[in-house]
Amino acid sequence: MMWKNIAGLSKAAAAARTHGSRRCFSTAIPGPCIVHKRGADILHDPWFNKDTGFPLTERDRLGIRGLLPPRVMTCVQQCDRFIESFRSLENNTKGEPENVVALAKWRMLNRLHDRNETLYYRVLIDNIKDFAPIIYTPTVGLVCQNYSGLYRRPRGMYFSAKDKGEMMSMIYNWPAPQVDMIVITDGSRILGLGDLGVQGIGIPIGKLDMYVAAAGINPQRVLPIMLDVGTNNEKLLQNDLYLGVRQPRLEGEEYLEIIDEFMEAAFTRWPKAVVQFEDFQAKWAFGTLERYRKKFCMFNDDVQGTAGVALAGLLGTVRAQGRPISDFVNQKIVVVGAGSAGLGVTKMAVQAVARMAGISESEATKNFYLIDKDGLVTTERTKLDPGAVLFAKNPAEIREGASIVEVVKKVRPHVLLGLSGVGGIFNEEVLKAMRESDSCKPAIFAMSNPTLNAECTAADAFKHAGGNIVFASGSPFENVELENGKVGHVNQANNMYLFPGIGLGTLLSGARIVTDGMLQAASECLASYMTDEEVQKGILYPSINNIRHITAEVGAAVLRAAVTDDIAEGHGDVGPKDLSHMSKEDTVNYITRNMWFPVYSPLVHEK
């Protein structure tokens, strides 16, 4: 079983990293690209514009000689030039409010994105640790809050309640003939910020930036989608700058009819595409997942991606205690937050326990405690969310509605995991109570995004819960210097470690649907990535600098699971039989060979 092989796989992963045996991209000279634009038009097309990177002969062919400064720069030189300007911006904004600086950085990157996509993604890949927090969490939350004011040019597609009956034709307005990856939101629950309506489009854009940078999906084959069915955010409805439909959200069948129509339209035009649902409110996150997962190739990142990343971290905490992975069945876990992410994490963890112990999922819930805004969920609760019913405890064990600190003191859990979206809810009293945990190395996961919504900071966790804890968060925090001179390692338990690999592996396997087996394979692969030595130090997740290698490994694991589940139909010239005959190393090599890398293609004009 996978669980028994994690230590061995960790050593193999470490060896691969140490000896550099695999490269996650190709820098071979690409073939020519046919374009139908010339002159200034080509300079205004971010897919093909090279700025000062056009060779002189190409400038002649495309009629742009004299429209650019005479010096020809390589992509590397252009990257260096951009980074120099970016560092200058950092120096010039020192002392400014954090939000002001974050938005200034985002604007600078966004202007490059709008002008030259190849250079944008080269800069992003080469500086992923610095720039991921700007184009993705946590800055993307700030961008969404201000998107109507920040909007300058369109990116992605918008399908609204006013477009009912027109989507099958609208989908052909997208200029790219092929789309591989779609990320869609309805804006109803953007990170921990609530209903942001049409302004939630920033989330699909940021997610797809990570698909390109981490998974090597060709940027000309990605599509951000905003389904605007209205908003219940009165502040937005009263804002004259708001760019969305100014009406309350559609509900019930009216809502589902809009999403049904979009899904039919998208898969009619691009039947091989993979669709990722993102930041839907809990009832629709679960509802649409169950509605579409067996019909279309789709998954929900909040429910399944977050769960996979959390499960990988939870398995790591067992290893950090010096215990075998099989001891996960004995871990007591308190989950704070019963939304789509919280329930998704709890469900996947329970499934893992059931699988390990050979028991039913109902029996496997014994050591899981779910807390929502009304306290501990028990069988006394009325109007309980259907997804939470399985985890309701007997009130004879702990009273209905018990607070977090009550539950922690009573249960003495090995893990306290937060997906509540409530900043600071793990206060000093709660964190100090974790000192009495039954674990020799208690784990605290503050996974809510953005940073202001994190259940606690890393500094507070190590200060109040003790220096021997394992800490993970959804947004980035700096490592903490402890009083004994050691370092309290901060792990970013972010979905970026999984969703790019899930999407890439699904795409290259040609899977008809995304199965639980594929998702579990992704999680187990991530769990096995770190060495025992790293885990003993409290390091559960790898450096984001290795994101392309991580994604290749996860993608290969997903592909192999698709083959095992007999749903892989192949991709391009690689058929299902070819996939089934691939070794583990073959699948990783196959994945890496198909990862796009930003280099300038020679452009050839045709009328």
UniProtKB/Swiss-Prot annotation:
Q: What is the annotated localization of this protein?
A: Mitochondrion
**Top EC class per UniProt?**
oxidoreductase
Q: How is its activity regulated?
A: Activated by 2-ketoglutarate, phosphoenolpyruvate (PEP), fructose 1,6-biphosphate (FBP) and coenzyme A (acetyl-CoA and CoA) as homodimer and by oxaloacetate (OAA), 2-ketoglutarate, succinate, fumarate and CoA as heterodimer NAD-MEH. Repressed by succinate and fumarate as homodimer, in the presence of NAD(+) and competitively toward the substrate L-malate.
InterPro entries per the record?
Answer: Aminoacid_DH-like_N_sf, Malic_enzyme_CS, Malic_N_dom, Malic_N_dom_sf, Malic_NAD-bd, Malic_OxRdtase, NAD(P)-bd_dom_sf
Q: How is the cofactor bound?
A: Divalent metal cations. Prefers magnesium or manganese.
Known tissue expression: Expressed in leaves, stems, flowers, and roots (at protein level). Present in pollen.
Annotated site, Important for activity, chain positions: D302
Keyword NAD recorded: yes
Q: Which residues form a coiled coil?
A: none
**This protein's UniProt keywords:** Metal-binding, Mitochondrion, NAD, Oxidoreductase, Transit peptide
Under catalytic activity, the entry for this protein gives: (S)-malate + NAD(+) = pyruvate + CO2 + NADH
Q: What does this protein do?
A: Involved in the regulation of sugars and amino acids metabolisms during the night period.
NCBIfam families registered for this protein in UniProt:
PRK13529.1
Tell me what this protein is called: NAD-dependent malic enzyme 2, mitochondrial
User: What high-level taxonomic lineage is stated for the organism?
Assistant: Eukaryota, Viridiplantae, Streptophyta, Embryophyta, Tracheophyta
